[in-house]
C-alpha cells in the first residue's frame, strides 16, 4: 500500500484535498451562515480575514480565509527587534552576506542542537531574491531540541515548505494541529501563526521558504488527470482552539525581512474557533507519490518527480520546485539509468531524508547532509556510480528502497550564507576530488591507428 508506515502515531483529524475550499468549526454554530462578517458573530467571536493574495487576484489564484476568533490578531504590544546574535536567518547584513560562487558544494550531516527551540534553531543556508519585493526563496536548515513555550511564530516573508529529516514536529497552528514526521512534508503559508513542540525528542530538517506566490501542484500535461502528488492526499487541519478566561503572557515572534522581532500579548494566539477558506497549512505523505518513469529507454528529465512548484512569472519556470527521488523501478533498455551528467540554468539544492541516493554510490552524500549545484555548475553521477551503471546487467531493478532524496530547484542563482559556507563547518572541501576527479577517460578515437 502506497502509504508510509510511521512509527509515531498521528492523533489528529484532517480535511483532505489540495487547494480545496474548506470549512471547519470546533464549536457547532460558530460559523456564520450565508455571510462572512455579521454585525455580531456567533458566540461573541470576532470575524477576521486572512489574505494570502491581493483581493483582485484571479479567482483561480485567490487565497483567503475567514476566521472567527476570541480576540483579533492585532491585540498585542509593539514588536521589537531581537538581538541579532539570537537568530540565524539574516541574509543581507555585512556579517551575514551571501556568497555567490560557482563551486559545487556538499555538506556533511548537519548537527542536532538540543539547546534551542524552533524559532532559534532556524539557520539560513542559501537563498536568492528579496522578501521585501516578494521575489525569491530562502533555504533553511532547522535543528532544535526544546519545545516552544507560551510562544507563537510566523513568517511575513513567505511560505515555509518543511521537510523533516529527524524527529517529529507537533505543530499547533491558528487553524488547527498537524503532526509532521520524516517522509512527510508540510507547508505553512505566509502569516499563519504556529507553535512547535517535539514529542519524540530533537528534530532536524530542511525548509524552502518561497517569497513569491504560493506552492502549487505541477501541471500534468499528457500524463493526464492523475499521478505524481494527487490532490486528494493532502491533509489540512480542523479547527482547534484554547479558551483562556484569565490573562496569560504570550510572546509572538515575527520573521520580517529575515529579521526576528517579538511582541507580547496577554492571551493565547490559538483562539480561532472556526474558519472557512482556501488559505491554510497542510501536510503530505511522500509515500503516496505516484512515480512516473521511462518504460522504454533513456532517463526522463527529473521534472517528472516534482511534488510542488512555486512558479515564476515565466510559464514553466519555477522560483522553487520541490522534487523527490522515491523508491522506483528502473527498466529502461540499453540506457545509462542514473541521472545523466548535467549543466543546468537552474540551481539545484539536494538533501537526503534517509537511505542512499542512487546517483551517489561512492559515499559522502548522507542523510541530514546536502549539496548545492548552482547555475551552470557541472554535476552528475560520481565515478563509482558511473562505473557501476555503465557495466550493470540491465534487468528490471528496484532502487531507492528505504531511501528518500529530494531537491529544491530554482531558476535563480543561489547565494550561500556565511553560516552555510563557513560557520557550520560542514562543507566537504574534497567534494570534486572525491566525486568527479577520479572519472577515467574511455574515449577511443576511431580515426587514430
From Swiss-Prot:
- Record has Ion transport as a keyword: no
Q: Does the keyword Iron apply?
A: yes
Q: What induces it?
A: Expression is induced by L-tyrosine. Expression is positively regulated by the cluster-specific transcription factor hmgR.
Q: Which SUPFAM superfamilies match?
A: RmlC-like cupins (SSF51182)
Name the cofactor(s) required for activity, per the record.
Fe cation
- What's in the keyword line of the UniProt record? Dioxygenase, Iron, Metal-binding, Oxidoreductase, Phenylalanine catabolism, Tyrosine catabolism
Gene Ontology BP terms: L-phenylalanine catabolic process; tyrosine catabolic process
State the deletion phenotype: Impairs growth on L-tyrosine as the sole carbon. Leads to the accumulation of homogentisic acid (HGA) and its subsequent polymerization to pyomelanin.
The record's listing under NCBIfam families reads: hmgA
Task: Indicate how activity is controlled.
Answer: Growth under standard conditions leads to moderate phosphorylation of mpkA and hppD and hmgA activities are balanced leading further to degradation of HGA and formation of 4-maleylacetoacetate. Cell wall stress, resulting in disturbance of balanced hppD and hmgA enzyme activity, (with reduced hmgA activity), leads to HGA accumulation that polymerizes to pyomelanin.
- Know the name of this protein? Homogentisate 1,2-dioxygenase hmgA
Amino acid at each position: 500500500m502506497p502509504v508510509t508506515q510511521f512509527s509515531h502515531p498521528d492523533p489528529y483529524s484532517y480535511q483532505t484535498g489540495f487547494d480545496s475550499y474548506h470549512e471547519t468549526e470546533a464549536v457547532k454554530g460558530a460559523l456564520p451562515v450565508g455571510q462572512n462578517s455579521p454585525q455580531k458573530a456567533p458566540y461573541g467571536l470576532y470575524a477576521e480575514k486572512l489574505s494570502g493574495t491581493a483581493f483582485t487576484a484571479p479567482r483561480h489564484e485567490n487565497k483567503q480565509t475567514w476566521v472567527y476568533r476570541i480576540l483579533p490578531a492585532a491585540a498585542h504590544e509593539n514588536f521589537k527587534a531581537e538581538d541579532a546574535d539570537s537568530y540565524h536567518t539574516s541574509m543581507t547584513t555585512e556579517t551575514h552576506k551571501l556568497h555567490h560562487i560557482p563551486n559545487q558544494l556538499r555538506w556533511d550531516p548537519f548537527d542536532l542542537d538540543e539547546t534551542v527551540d524552533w524559532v532559534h534553531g532556524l539557520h539560513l543556508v542559501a537563498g536568492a531574491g528579496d522578501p521585501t519585493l516578494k521575489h525569491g526563496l530562502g533555504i533553511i536548515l532547522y535543528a532544535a531540541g526544546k519545545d516552544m513555550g507560551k510562544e507563537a511564530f510566523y513568517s511575513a516573508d513567505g511560505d515555509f515548505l518543511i521537510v523533516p529529516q529527524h524527529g517529529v514536529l507537533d505543530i499547533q497552528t491558528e487553524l488547527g494541529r498537524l503532526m509532521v514526521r520524516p517522509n512527510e512534508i508540510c507547508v505553512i503559508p505566509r502569516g499563519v501563526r504556529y507553535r512547535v513542540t517535539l514529542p519524540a525528542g530533537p528534530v532536524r530538517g530542511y525548509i524552502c521558504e518561497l517569497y513569491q506566490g504560493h506552492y502549487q501542484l505541477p501541471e500534468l500535461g499528457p500524463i493526464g488527470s492523475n499521478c505524481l502528488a494527487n490532490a486528494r492526499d493532502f491533509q489540512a487541519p480542523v479547527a482547534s482552539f484554547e479558551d483562556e478566561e484569565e490573562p496569560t503572557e504570550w510572546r509572538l515572534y515575527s520573521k520580517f525581512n529575515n529579521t526576528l522581532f517579538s511582541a507580547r500579548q496577554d492571551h493565547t494566539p490559538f483562539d480561532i474557533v472556526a474558519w472557512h477558506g482556501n488559505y491554510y497549512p497542510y501536510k503530505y505523505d511522500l509515500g503516496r507519490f505516484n512515480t512516473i518513469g521511462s518504460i522504454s529507454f533513456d532517463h526522463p528529465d527529473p521534472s517528472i518527480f516534482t511534488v510542488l512548484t512555486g512558479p515564476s512569472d515565466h510559464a514553466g519556470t519555477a522560483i522553487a520546485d520541490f522534487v523527490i527521488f522515491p523508491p522506483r523501478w528502473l527498466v529502461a533498455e540499453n540506457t545509462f539509468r542514473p541521472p545523466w551528467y548535467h549543466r543546468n540554468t537552474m540551481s539545484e539544492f539536494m538533501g537526503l531524508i534517509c537511505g542512499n541516493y542512487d546517483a551517489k554510490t561512492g559515499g559522502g552524500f548522507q542523510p541530514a547532509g546536502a549539496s548545492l549545484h548552482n547555475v551552470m555548475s557541472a554535476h552528475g553521477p560520481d565515478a563509482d556510480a558511473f562505473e557501476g551503471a555503465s557495466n550493470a546487467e540491465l534487468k528490471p531493478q528496484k532502487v531507492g528502497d528505504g531511501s528518500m532524496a529530494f531537491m529544491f530547484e530554482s531558476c535563480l542563482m543561489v547565494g550561500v550564507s556565511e553560516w552555510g559556507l563557513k560557520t557550520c563547518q560542514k562543507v566537504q572541501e574534497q567534494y570534486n576530488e572525491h566525486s568527479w576527479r577520479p572519472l577515467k577517460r574511455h574515449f577511443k578515437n576511431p580515426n587514430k591507428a
